Structures are given as structure tokens and as C-alpha cells.
Regions:
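His/Asp/Glu-rich metal-coordinating catalytic cores
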Residues: 2-71, 76-289, 308-322, 341-344
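Conserved small/polar residues in nucleotide/adenosyl-binding loops
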Residues: 489-496
Length: 497
């Protein structure tokens, strides 16, 4: 791309549009680039052997001298999960709120990047200067604490990026969304609004997180004599807090299972975002020392992930927890689009084992519905609308809301990943495209697996056989030879992985 010297701001989404996940957007003005979020997405069903998917950041690598930093809206995987991979090639400072930095630090430790990466904690209401940009962090509500919207000030004008948000007047922890600040910035004149589209098809308002706490209380009261197992997102600290509150109220000990759940709860408690009464939390190995009616287990696996703790319990391969008849199992989440089949499979397996599975009324969304989106538009009064965070139908639904609120059709842009939008107060247009794409992470390999290998893995899964040959001593079972493997399939040897 040519150097931007025409007084226009460039907005370049490198992922996160027309999909759920892999959120990352570059904002460029002259010789400054600021990157908002750096998330991953999870593999599709046909991506055999793939652990996760990260965005192709070739554009950032090609313009590394301009990149001033990553600004992160909140600590969900689809907004921070790609950082350990991208930082190896684009190592610039990270700016985020306290809990978000804490969760990022966990990832950087796992990848031995903590010492080599600069991080700075920003409070809501504070601003940072990065090159030509000033970026203000605004308090919002979401299904994880410390979520932020961003007011991005540039010489071309102000852009507000909502991040993932909802309007919750009675949050479990902290303050409600700072609607007053949205209105104050709106009075200054906002060039563009980039707003969360996830629930743009849903009418009304999203319910408060506190309503789930009432549901938990009712379930605990109705199931006093059974063990309770609750699966939810590891990062939903408010949800975990309400589970702990109900467990304490009804005299139950709480155990946690799943590596990500243990890490998040540990970080949140250490930073003061989770209040755990003394002697309430016990190690998973200790639950056998308590009657079933005195135990609550919080676990990962709400999305049916094959290797998550609840899925392993359902398949009878979990080393520490065996599902018992009459266990009460609560799915405190909705399936992410694409995960419905996997979740249904786990529910069926649990039901076959005699468990009472509850998956209704135990979850509320962390994303704004139509009336909340319209409220933000009314406060901000943007000249241009750029729907973000969602599949195409979600982006289109928000575009319709923007039109209903009086924004001209020509000022509404449904962008695609890689589009280059140039805008100022006089005009806005899509002027080009940069290279984007998805990079597949397979174990320790990043970008090593392509479509040909995925196709051949599919062939192997459907039409292949592998034989393992070994020789054992008859009486002692001592290995004498091998193991050797023989495979029969259509794969070409140099493409087999």
C-alpha cells in the first residue's frame, strides 16, 4: 500500500469479520499503526488435527516500523489468543486493563515471552498516546470483567470501537457501562462507530448477569441431595462468582477442573476480581472426602470440546471424576455457532449415564441486543457506521439498525477482512485490499499445515487403516521388537503429516 499522506485515517480489519473469532484491526495514520485486539478462532469440524486458527499478520510485519502497540479491549480468547504467536514477529507493547493483562501474562508465561514483552495496565478513563493516536479506555460491561470500549483520537477524527459489550445496570462486579462518557464524546463529533454486532438480530435488551445468579439459587435449592457440576466459559469470572456465592449459601465446597478454568480463577482471585470465602475452594482430589450433596464442581467443556474436562467425564476417560446417576449437570452457556453438534453429543452421553442435565435459563449473553446497540448509536451520533464482530448476517442486521436511526446508506460500510477503508470528515471509501488469511496451528507447528494436508487427513479418517506391529516376550510381556507401523491409504508419502 502507498504511504498515507492525504490526511485520511485508514481502518484495516485483518480478521474478525464475517466470522466469530480472530478479531484484529489495524488503525493507520501516516507513519503510525495501532492494532486493536489480537484473537484466535477455533477450528472447523473438517480441520482435523488443528488446535487453533490465528490471523495472518503479513501487513503488520511488512510495516513493523509503524506499529506502535496492541490495544486490547478484553481478555477473551477471540481477542487475546493469538498474541503469543503474533508477538514472535510483531513484538510491540501491549496496553489493556488489569485483569486483561493478567490473563495475557498467563499466556506469555506458557510461551516464554513474558520477559521479552512490554505490557502496561491502563485504567478506565485513562488515555495513552501512540504515535499520531490518542486512545481512551471507556468502561463497558461484558461476560468478562474489565472490558473496555476505545475512543481512538486521530488527526482525521474520533473513532469509537465498542469492543464486545452489553448494557448491564446491575453488574455482579464493578460499575455499569459508562454511558455518560459515550455521550460526552458524542458531543465532540464522532467520525465512525465500530459496534459489536453479535446480537444485532435480537430484539430488546440483554438480561443482566445477576439473573443467572437467581437461576443458580433456584437450582441449588431444588437439587439439595445431588452433586452439582457446572460447565461454563473459563473467562466468565462473574458467572464463577455467582456459582461460588450459591455454593457458599447452601454449604457446598467448590472444586475447579480444567486447566484454563484453574488459571483464570487463580488470576482473577489474585487480582481481586473474585471473592472466595475461606475454606470454600477445595482441590479436585479432595471432593471424594465430601458427600455428593456438599460438592459443586466448576468445569470447562461447555462447548463440547473433545479434550475439555466435561467431555472426558462424559466419555468415562477423566482420571478424577466419574459421572454418577442423579448428578445435576448445568450447561451455563450457549453453544457458539458451529459447536451445536458437539454440545449435543456431550449432553446425550451425560444423560445416558443417568445425570440430570440442565441447559435452559442458566445463561445470559454478554453481547448487546438491538435496543442497546441503538442506545450507543443515539449517544455517539457517528457520521459513519462500521459494524464489526459477527458473521455477515449479524453485520447486515446492524447496518439495518443504523439506517433506521438515520445514518445514510452511503455512510454505512460492511467491510471484509483485508479491506482498506480511508476516511475523514469529508469522505469515506474502500480504497484497496491487503493480504489476510488464516494460519493453522497444529501442535508446535504454526502455518505448516495447508489445504492439501487437511484434505488428505480427511481421506485417512474416512478411508484408511494403520496397523501397529510389535513383538512381546510371551510370559513377561517385555518388548522384543518394534513397534513398527504400516499404513494403507491414498496419501502421498511426502504429504503425510
Amino acid at each position: 500500500m502507498k504511504k498515507n499522506n492525504n490526511g485520511k485515517l485508514r481502518i484495516i480489519p485483518l480478521g474478525g469479520l464475517e466470522q466469530i473469532g480472530m478479531n484484529i484491526t489495524a488503525f493507520e495514520y501516516e507513519d503510525s499503526i495501532v492494532v486493536v485486539d489480537c484473537g484466535l478462532s477455533f477450528p472447523e469440524d473438517d480441520m482435523l488435527g488443528i488446535d487453533l486458527v490465528i490471523p495472518d499478520v503479513t501487513y503488520l510485519k511488512d510495516n513493523i516500523d509503524k506499529v506502535k502497540g496492541f490495544v486490547i479491549t478484553h481478555g477473551h480468547e477471540d481477542h487475546i489468543g493469538a498474541l503469543p504467536y503474533v508477538l514472535r514477529e510483531v513484538n510491540v507493547p501491549i496496553y489493556a486493563t488489569k485483569l486483561t493483562i493478567g490473563l495475557i501474562d498467563n499466556k506469555l508465561k506458557e510461551h516464554n515471552l513474558l520477559r521479552s514483552t512490554k505490557r502496561k495496565v491502563i485504567k478506565h478513563g485513562q488515555s495513552i498516546n501512540l504515535g499520531c493516536f490518542r486512545i481512551e479506555f471507556i468502561k463497558t460491561n461484558h461476560s468478562i470483567q474489565d472490558a473496555s470500549a476505545l475512543a481512538i483520537y486521530s488527526p482525521a477524527g474520533i473513532v469509537i470501537h465498542t469492543g464486545d459489550f452489553k448494557v448491564d445496570y446491575t453488574p455482579v462486579f464493578g460499575d455499569a457501562i459508562d454511558l455518560q462518557r459515550f455521550a460526552e464524546i458524542g458531543k465532540k463529533g464522532v467520525l465512525a462507530l465500530m459496534c459489536d454486532s453479535t446480537n444485532a438480530e435480537r430484539k430488546g435488551f440483554t438480561m443482566s448477569e445477576r439473573t443467572v445468579g437467581k437461576t443458580f439459587d433456584n437450582i441449588f435449592a431444588e437439587h439439595r441431595n445431588t452433586r452439582i457440576i457446572i460447565a461454563t466459559f473459563a473467562s466468565n469470572v462473574d458467572r464463577v462468582q455467582q456459582i461460588i456465592n450459591s455454593a457458599y449459601k447452601y454449604g457446598r465446597k467448590v472444586a475447579v477442573e480444567g486447566r484454563s478454568m484453574v488459571n483464570v480463577i487463580g488470576t482473577a482471585a489474585e487480582l481481586g476480581y473474585l471473592q472466595i470465602p475461606d475454606k470454600t475452594l477445595v482441590d479436585i482430589d479432595q471432593i471424594k472426602n465430601y458427600p455428593d450433596d456438599k460438592v459443586v464442581l466448576i468445569t470447562t467443556g461447555s462447548q463440547g470440546e473433545s479434550m475439555a474436562a466435561l467431555s472426558r467425564m462424559a466419555a468415562n476417560i477423566h482420571k478424577k471424576v466419574t459421572i454418577k446417576p442423579n448428578d445435576t449437570i448445568i450447561f451455563s452457556s450457549n453453544p457458539i455457532p458451529g459447536n451445536e453438534k458437539a454440545v449435543s453429543k456431550v449432553i446425550n452421553e451425560l444423560s445416558r449415564k443417568g445425570a440430570d442435565v440442565i441447559f435452559q435459563d442458566a445463561h445470559v449473553s454478554g453481547h448487546a441486543c438491538q435496543e442497546e446497540i441503538k442506545l450507543i448509536y443515539s449517544l455517539v451520533k457517528p457520521k459513519y457506521s462500521i459494524p464489526v464482530h459477527g458473521e455477515y448476517r449479524h453485520l447486515k442486521a446492524q447496518a439495518g439498525l443504523a439506517r433506521d436511526l438515520g445514518i445514510p446508506k452511503e455512510n454505512i460500510f460492511i467491510m471484509h477482512s483485508g479491506d482498506v477503508m480511508e476516511l475523514n470528515d469529508e469522505s469515506a471509501e474502500i480504497t484497496g485490499k491487503v493480504h489476510t488469511g488464516a494460519i493453522l496451528v497444529d501442535g508446535l507447528g504454526v502455518g505448516d499445515v495447508g489445504n492439501i494436508v487437511l484434505r488428505d487427513r480427511q481421506h485417512l479418517a474416512e478411508d484408511g487403516i494403520m496397523i501397529v506391529v510389535l513383538t512381546l516376550e510371551k510370559y513377561s510381556n517385555q518388548l522384543l521388537a518394534g513397534p513398527d507401523t504400516v499404513s494403507y491409504t491414498h496419501l502421498r508419502a511426502h504429504e503425510t503429516r
